[in-house]
């Protein structure tokens, strides 16, 4: 059968999948659907987990179906054309830098990606002797880069105020708002504000749902829903006064966990677009589609190179799982921007799995003084905001034990004497030290350093002969590869711990409105009960032990989130109460007595009176 693919790919990309069929979880946005590939993720061993998540990541590069093109994809003509148009707008700012600015903005993972990319492209410009033109905005400020503060993305006015501050006095500002599910009020407000002020601002919306699936419930402090904002942007795109970049990348391997594919696709799409703008700006030409495709293929190669190490990634997954099962801690110690990736992975486990901030933590080794907008925000804020080398040496190293795991993440271009000195100090406390090492063909890890690591994942990259801007491709590849490894390891470890039901994050922490609606959808999916009954049960658990009054029932979602984000096991408690028709107190007692959250829920699902299998439940209603 002849190939239906238009482009030559580095990796074997999947054919269109079951999730693209019109009737598959029809009421649910793509970014919240369950991925058919991983519907039995909770039953998989470490090797299978790595394989499945690798297949999900490959879906990022999948082309749209030729016979039944349901959704536009990363390689779709419409997406590539929009990428080129946005690259041209960025070039206009680069050519006339006085009064110009490129803002990358988002909440949670999207905001952390905005931070990482602004750091990278400012470094690129400094290396050329140019004035840096990038900045980032993250809901909740710099503290949200290194700690879990997802609730801050629920305010549109907060987003607008932050944008006004950084854009004051500027003449031309490209604002790239990132919201994986097209749902974050922080971004919606900024996009609307930009459209009201097109003399200065050009808004670019990046997400991975069709606009018809953007969130449409009211934003508490804004006049429009996210969908209305996105629809307005689509109309203004006809005059190139706004742009929407929203290719479908398929559901997450772990349902709704946008830190994974959503974060990776954000990085791939925007680094491709921005790097193409920089590579061609001095040539006086607009970026070409060929330039975009060349860069996209290097990211495909990163997938190929990374997942060629699947067996070693699985070994690390098992080791991290053992540490967490024994109530130990996992410390991810990364050099330069790989340290940012490590911090992101640790922080995102908190709300994703209901983890403690000490369970998996990232640390950045290297100078970070020029990275943050307001570094003072991070001083003396408490242990959950610590992330530097000094923090690791003073607060972690003295208390390391044999049940902890330390993972060193570095390249052979880093200061290897510094790596060795720190590794030797860690080895004095614990033998459980691992490494993720990036090298280029021809480089080798010095023997004295190699022997310090009982187990290591060594990823060797081919030599690339690029100009200066192009040399950043390898830096971006290594960051993406590190992200894929760490996301897979931390997700896999929590799967092995019994935190996942099928491919759903049953024990997530309800930290913002998006997660509130996701919690409700899970209750509907697994209980088979009405939306009204599930809301009632969810609110009862959130506000327990206080009885629900009509005033509480009628309160805005933000009020419920404010209470819920401090509580543990909200969703499993509500689900048990629904399935067993028992009190909240009894549900809590059953969970407390169980060795695994998901085991007690599985038992309830298969018990008397549960007539339908999990698969039989209909689609939940998502606003």
From Swiss-Prot:
GO terms for biological process: carbohydrate derivative metabolic process; intracellular glucose homeostasis; negative regulation of glucokinase activity; protein import into nucleus; protein localization to nucleus; response to fructose; response to glucose. It is found in: Cytoplasm; Nucleus; Mitochondrion. GO terms for molecular function: carbohydrate binding; fructose-6-phosphate binding; glucose sensor activity; kinase binding; kinase inhibitor activity; protein domain specific binding. Residues 90-286, 320-476 form the SIS domain. InterPro entries: GKRP_SIS_2, Glucokinase_regulatory_CS, MURQ/GCKR, SIS_dom, SIS_dom_sf. Residues 199-200 are annotated as: Important for interaction with GCK. Pfam families: GKRP-like_C, GKRP_SIS_2, GKRP_SIS_N. Its main location: cytoplasm. Disruption phenotype: Mice appear normal and are fertile. Their body weights do not differ significantly from the body weights of wild-type animals up to 60 weeks of age. Mice however show a substantial decrease in hepatic glucokinase (Gck) expression and enzymatic activity, with no change in basal blood glucose levels. However, following a glucose tolerance test, mice show impaired glucose clearance, possibly because they cannot recruit sufficient glucokinase due to the absence of a nuclear reserve. The keyword Transferase does not apply. Residues 463-465 are annotated as: Essential for interaction with GCK. The keyword Zinc does not apply. Interacts (fructose 6-phosphate bound form) with GCK. This is Glucokinase regulatory protein. It comes from Mus musculus. The gene is Gckr.
